[in-house]
Amino acid sequence: MSTSSSSAAERDFKREFLKIFFLVFAVLLIGFSIFFLNHHEKNKYIIETLELNGSAEDGDALFKMNCVGCHGITARGLVGPDLHSITKRLNDKQIIKQVTGGLTPPMPSFEIDPINMSNLLEYLHSLE
């Protein structure tokens, strides 16, 4: 009797273990899938942006609407840093991530379409 009850307990333990194992596996699989899909979308955005030929003039207008409050009308910095020569300190991919992700507080993140991001990059390159 004790043998059958111990083997029943073993089976119950194995079932519970397998349930937990597969649950953890499923959660990890979903988490990794979400991460990689999001990462792919960001790379797609960056690639699309970098393939465009932006306009410094349009980028200047965009800058004046969204950025002067922190970076100043001449982009020399106020609350935010001076952006002259920013393209010598950061590459275009890093700048895109900074603008869209707000990586260094208090910089907010901006949802900006690829053509406007390309325009902003051209404007920043013109500040050198």
Describe the function of each predicted region:
Residues 32, 81-82:
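Extracytoplasmic/periplasmic beta-strand context in beta-sandwich domains
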Residues 76-79:
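Iron-sulfur (Fe-S) cluster-binding segments and ferredoxin-like electron-carrier domains
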Residues 35-62:
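Electrostatic cytochrome c docking/interface patches
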Residues 55, 63-69, 74, 103, ...:
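Short pre-active-site segment immediately N-terminal to redox-active cysteine/selenocysteine motifs
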Residues 74, 84-128:
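Extracytoplasmic electron-transfer domains, predominantly the class I c-type cytochrome c fold
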Residues 11-41, 111-128:
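C-terminal capping alpha-helices of c-type cytochrome domains
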Residues 1-13:
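N-terminal Lys/Arg-rich, disordered targeting/topogenic segments
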